[in-house]
Amino acid sequence: LVGSEMCIRDRYQFDHEVWEGFRFWDLVMPLFLFMTGASMPFSLSKYKTASVDYWPVYRRILKRVILLFIFGMIVQGNLLGFDSKHIYFYSNTLQSIAVGYFIAAVIQLHFSFGWQIIITLLLLLAYWIPMTFLGDFTPAGNFAEQVDRWVLGRFRDGVFWNEDGTWSFSSQYNYTWIWSSLTFGVTVMLGAFAGKIMKEGKANRKKVVQILLLIG
């Protein structure tokens, strides 16, 4: 099929949209976040008791978060290149999973299901307000981009170095991470809600499928 008309027509689906639009490839990272959340009701439910000691729980959670961040820096952050000019702190799907997982773990460990829904909606609202009313909707002018540039500075992926030793932000790199972490947490929580439905509906799998299809 390589080189066929169908392949040529559809291959653009296996890359991210430059800015506006949507492609199949844009589903990959959210799907990983969602699957992470779907497993959490099964793994965290045993810790939701009044007498639980949360320190060992958080120690395991933080260990996973740190490992995912390190692996992310190895995969895409150029950590093993040992070149300080090309090391990026927050630039990878693994790191977005780490942050989303941590946010969702805190919510699930300490809040009832009703409050989990409310907090998830509040996270979306907290993301939406500055994105709508601060900055603009251009790649370089949106609020999330400005936060990344301010917090990460030259350790942001997409930075390029000039011959005189100065650095600049690339106009071709439009991915945002710091402020978008709120939505990473939301996506993991959506997976957790789906996982809760599956966990509590094991006796009637047909109904579980119907509910999941109904809510999308």
Describe the residue ranges of each PLM region:
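Membrane helical hairpin/interfacial module
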Residues: 9-89, 94-97, 101
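Hydrophobic cores of alpha-helical transmembrane segments in multi-pass inner/ER membrane proteins
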Residues: 29-39, 97-109, 183-195
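Lipid-exposed faces of alpha-helical membrane segments in multi-pass integral membrane proteins
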Residues: 34, 70-74, 103, 107, ...
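Membrane-water interface regions at transmembrane-helix termini and the short interhelical loops
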Residues: 45-49, 80-82, 99-116, 126, ...
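Membrane-interface helix-boundary motifs at transmembrane edges
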Residues: 49-58, 110-115, 197-208
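Long hydrophobic alpha-helical segments that form multi-pass transmembrane helix bundles
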Residues: 113-186
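A conserved active-site cap/scaffold subdomain adjacent to cofactor or substrate pockets
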Residues: 173-216
